[in-house]
Amino acid sequence: AGVARSSPRTARWAAAAAEDVPREREKFTDAAWSAMEEAPKVAERFGSQYVETEHVFMALLEQPTGALSARILEKAGVKSATALANAQAWAAKQPKVSVPGGTVEASSAGRSLVTMLTETNGASKLWKDKYISVEHLLFAFAKDTRCGQKIMQDLGLPMDKLKKAIDEVRGKS
């Protein structure tokens, strides 16, 4: 896997996070880091001043067809398009910031995202992985008390079923 460089935008919002939050590109797989870099753009599309968990989730689901996040959800019996629509509906209901004649730049990590990223450390240990991957981001999102648990519940995807799907896609079933 190639090494991607951090964009200034990603570096800014990630630097605002707490000390125990992984924020260096070198700690992520390429696909996971790609989602982290896309999340601020997703947040901006929804007029959010903060990058939050739903923005990372949507960035994961908007990755090219055949992406790992979609394969995991499909393995769990959830259509990725449905998951994306649910996350978009959630994001559309959140407070928005508007700038006359301009666009909002989402450059700060929200509290739930900071918590979710901290959770990725536990997920990487659970699977004994060196790098934070798409699977870890999905698993940590499902634990998010702000919106992840609600979205996953609406999709009929409890934690045990998600973990089983991750294990199966990883070839550990």
Predicted features along the sequence, with ranges:
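Histone-fold recognition with a strong bias for associated Lys/Arg-rich disordered tails
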Residues: 2-173
